[in-house]
A protein has these predicted regions:
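Intrinsically disordered, low-complexity Ser/Thr/Pro/Gly-rich regulatory segments
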Residues: 1-297
């Protein structure tokens, strides 16, 4: 029971918040309005927060260009709360068609920023940076609205369909978007992730006797770096590992992109292998720091 309570909001709290929300719904000049006071907001916010916690995979301390994963988490939970409240209000409004004409949130960028600033500890600069990143860019090749769900109607208005927030995988979409933008922070994150992968391999290789391990070693010319290499002294053989952090594909274009990433990685390994075979002593010296030996792999 305690485990279940840690994952889900008590039913009575959500039920009470839902009842208060429904009771507050009214129409002014044909537009829906409703309360988002603390007794309503906090209950739905906690539900959205628990959803994030139960599905999150990225370390909060990871930094992007102008914000961290922790900042993005606060932004997303707040905007998801707003979307959920708005969706419930439309469904329970009693208006024909569940008030479908009001289903899409339309506000100025300043209004969106202020709502999130009032409900979180984020600075307006961080909020604005995230909002700008998530605003749809039609010039971005093979873009998808799930990556950038805010749509600019004009310079003073942004439109947001709540289901694009509520039905998305925020961390995965964020990484995919940054990768698509070829942002420097993506490559920084890739290096961080590869470091985590190296640590995971270390937990295994650290238990194996008579091996040498090398990481992040540079090779001459245009050859790629060696991400991870293992020299087994008993069999006198070397394993070269090319580490790749690939975001799971969820569209045809991403499937092709992952195939290209894998082909590129295989090509890099092939180049390193050819160098190791043709210049074995030099390879061992550069990667493992060993002088020329008669007992080379």
């Amino acid at each position: 029971d305690q485990a279940m309570e840690s994952k889900f909001m008590p039913t009575q709290d959500l039920s009470s918040a839902n009842s208060k929300l429904i009771a507050s719904i009214k129409f002014q000049d044909g537009c829906i309005s409703y309360s988002t006071d603390e007794s309503i907001w906090d209950s739905f916010y906690e539900m959205m927060e628990r959803q994030w916690v139960n599905t999150s995979e990225l370390p909060e301390e990871w930094e992007f260009d102008k914000f961290s994963v922790k900042d993005f988490k606060q932004f997303w939970i707040a905007i998801a709360t707003l979307c959920f409240i708005h969706m419930i209000a439309c469904l329970k409004s009693g208006a024909p068609g569940a008030d479908v004409q009001e289903a899409v949130l339309i506000k100025s960028p300043t209004e969106f920023v202020q709502i999130i600033a009032d409900k979180t500890e984020l600075s307006t600069d961080s909020i604005s940076a995230i909002l700008k990143l998530l605003t749809y860019n039609s010039r971005l090749k093979n873009n998808d609205i799930v990556y950038q769900p805010f749509v600019e109607i004009d310079k003073d208005r942004l439109a947001l369909a709540p289901h694009l927030i509520l039905a998305s995988r925020p961390e995965r979409n964020l990484i995919s978007l940054i990768h698509k933008l070829r942002d420097k922070s993506y490559f920084d994150l890739t290096n961080l992730r590869e470091g985590i992968m190296q640590d995971e391999i270390d937990t295994v290789t650290g238990k194996i006797p008579n091996i040498l391990v090398a990481k992040n070693k540079s090779l001459p010319g245009t050859l790629p770096d060696v991400d991870y290499a293992i020299w087994d002294k008993e069999s006198n053989s070397i394993l070269i590992c090319e580490l790749k952090w690939l975001v799971e594909a969820d569209s045809t274009s991403e499937v092709f992109a992952r195939v290209q990433d894998l082909e590129h990685g295989c090509s890099q390994v092939s180049d390193m292998l050819a160098y190791a075979q043709n210049q074995c002593s030099d390879f061992c010296n550069k990667v493992f720091g060993l002088a020329i030996s008669d007992n080379l792999p």
